[in-house]
């Protein structure tokens, strides 16, 4: 099975953007656990918002937008956000300068990582993306942080 021309084109554009972004500046792969806090109306946003101020290029699998929106939907169901808040959060997320990579292009290496680590495929998509671009991973998920350390993916820290 081959990658669709559309998927190939998006991936090529991301690679071109990454290549021209700057020597020595590692891109940062952002997962849903980080993006969630940016627009969730949380009182404890912590240092996660500092990620938006970085000079590094932000990269994410397209899966991240759906995962993040699902987390906001859970807050909606609990009465912690209203539908307008969720819609605004989605709009703000999609307006960010994030290079979106088709998740389908990461499934083979992610499946290998999932098998090797005994870790969910969803998280391994982020790991596969970080490994394929020598990127740093930004996540608030402790299990994913441990998996990243096991495969040699560097972790982002607000402390620099």
What are these regions (language model features)?
Residues 42, 143-144, 160:
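Short, acidic/turn-prone active-site loops that include or flank metal/cofactor-
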Residues 100-102, 154-160:
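Short acidic-hydrophobic, aromatic-tinged amphipathic segments that line or gate anion-handling sites
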Residues 9, 17, 95-143:
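Active-site neighborhoods of divalent-metal-dependent phosphate/nucleic-acid chemistry enzymes
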Residues 145-150:
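Short loop/helix-cap segments at secondary-structure boundaries that form the rim of catalytic
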Residues 69-101, 109:
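Active-site-proximal, substrate-binding regions of enzyme catalytic domains
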Residues 1-63, 75-88, 151:
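Short, well-structured N-terminal submotif of metal-dependent ribonuclease cores
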